[in-house]
Amino acid sequence: MTIIRVKENEPFEVAMRRFKRTIEKNGLLTELRAREFYEKPTAERKRKKAAAVKRHYKRIRGQMLPKKLY
């Protein structure tokens, strides 16, 4: 649970920004979005495997030598 103590004479916008930053740092929003709807275990495995393949190809693309530009 995220608790933000509002300091004296602190504007609401500043407190809200601090709250958003701490929630983002804790990863609560991403977890909330992931748990919003039930995902079948097979669908979850399929999504994670597709993400791993995408990361793999992205890593390979970064290691490739650039084509000669002449």
From Swiss-Prot:
For this UniProt record, the keywords arranged alphabetically read as follows: Ribonucleoprotein, Ribosomal protein
GO annotation terms (biological process): translation
Q: Does the keyword Coiled coil apply?
A: no
Which species is this UniProt entry from?
A: Burkholderia thailandensis (strain ATCC 700388 / DSM 13276 / CCUG 48851 / CIP 106301 / E264)
UniProt GO cellular component terms: ribonucleoprotein complex; ribosome
What's the family? Answer: Belongs to the bacterial ribosomal protein bS21 family.
Presence of keyword Repeat: no
Query: NCBIfam families under this entry?
Result: S21p
Query: What is the protein name stated in its UniProt record?
Result: Small ribosomal subunit protein bS21B
Pfam families documented for this protein: Ribosomal_S21
Picking any one GO molecular function of the record gives: structural constituent of ribosome
